[in-house]
Amino acid sequence: MLRVHRLYSTRGAAEVLHAAPKYALRCGLEIHTQLNTRNKLFSLSTNDPFQAAATPNYHTSFFDISLPGTQPRLNYEAVLYAIKLSLALDCRVNLKSQFDRKHYFYGDQPLGYQITQHYNPIAKDGKLCLYGAYDNIPEDEKTIGIIQLQLEQDTGRSLYKDTDGMTLIDLNRSNVPLVEMVTQPDFTDVKQVRAFVKKYQNLVRHLNISTGDLETGAMRVDVNMSVNGHARVELKNLPNTSSITNAIRYEYQRQVDIIRSGQADKMLKDVETRGWTGSATIKLRSKESTIDYRYMPDPEIPVLLLEPEVVHRVATALPELPDQTLRKLMAEPYNLSLKDAKILTTNSNSHGNFYTHHDLRNYFMKTFQLFTAKTGASNSKLPANWIIHELLGIINKLEIPLPKILQLLPASHFAEFLALIHDNELSKSSAKLLLFHIINDFKESHCSNLALPDFRLLIEQYNLNPLNEVEEHALTELCQYVLRELNDDALVADLVSGKKKNALKFLLGKGMRLSQGKVDPALLEGAFKSVLGIKW
């Protein structure tokens, strides 16, 4: 029943978001991002909160567990990572910032306060632009303002399951460096929120400052939203993108229903924090129970002063940002589709350790340049099709890391392979078989045989030379054989009439397999049409 209720609630809310302009959504985000520095923010403990999960409290120092007399020592690598992200988000980096104490009591915060940057954060006044063409939002362009970025320490983890009623505390995560980013309430549509989260996630991965994983807590998103200017509601416990969007949809519908019932002045007058159960939002606390954090400057940490030269050097070393790369790949000379360009610019972490988008993109661009120089085919789709689709398919199937493939098939060698296809010295179907054979043999040698394959020798060895000149009667006999073996008059009739035009591809596939990929597909298609008398 819960499953049915969740689907009904979120779908209904989605419809209202698009169909109820009288009920204006305003939404802002707070995103906490763990930085993958070598050490923690204020100690020399190893920053490894997840891989050490099997050994609680393993990566901890005296400061992490708050032994009396220990003092914080700022990790400047975290400062540089924060500057890097600030510049990528077009923020104004403050040359003078400070750390403050945010006081509250909880078991996973042994200090009794969190060290953060409340009054003078490291950066302010940034933005991230979303585009209809790239980010799947209704508008052509939407700019989301960023209020500030601040450095702060993470808390430990409280564990409740299978503990006989006890709460266990793991401090491996305590004092891990975080950047908290706070946006302006500029979101007016749930699609904008989804696009922003995905874009920000890809950005921190692209900058190599965080894994950006929502499921592990390396990136955590809180939502602040209101409808028609009523009191703000904060949404927490949002472990993934679908939870974020579904919670917003559900809460939007809940508030719209309250407004329609005339109860808004009573039920939406106070700031409220609500959690997401997976099917509904539930009240956690209201304004009356809001915590007074008693912020104060941390007397043990000096004011952070940055030289302008430091910011300039970080800006100079900043890599090309994903949107810039996307535009480049979709323009001359590459002319990639949006889907293919995103494969080369989006680091989804779903491919494990097989490849990174950075390495894959560099391999594609280098291969493209060498292939173009070799063949003069400036607008060819061959490099994109064979690297993004065929080669990646083999990498994922055989589970071979791209760096190993680059040793076997460097860009210059793969460009030569593509040139053989371009010059009709190797058919596409034979090329697929040959490429898989080469890489599979490489895997079976435990990736130790690094001799560059001789493509022409292999083509001769396996008799893969294409049949460029085939007598018409031979093609006719091949088509007739395929049709006899198929023995499906109804399908053939639908094909000839045009009801099932895709059936021709089915016949072509059978014919190509019988010819071992040696026949030109265009010639074979013409032969089938001639044999069947197809007029369309």
From Swiss-Prot:
A Gene Ontology cellular-component term: glutamyl-tRNA(Gln) amidotransferase complex
Catalytic activity, as annotated: L-glutamyl-tRNA(Gln) + L-glutamine + ATP + H2O = L-glutaminyl-tRNA(Gln) + L-glutamate + ADP + phosphate + H(+)
Record has Mitochondrion as a keyword: yes
Major enzyme class: ligase
Gene Ontology molecular function terms on file: ATP binding; glutaminyl-tRNA synthase (glutamine-hydrolyzing) activity
Localization of this protein: Mitochondrion
SUPFAM superfamilies: GatB/YqeY motif, Glutamine synthetase/guanido kinase
Similarity-based family: Belongs to the GatB/GatE family. GatB subfamily.
Name of the protein described by the UniProt record: Glutamyl-tRNA(Gln) amidotransferase subunit B, mitochondrial
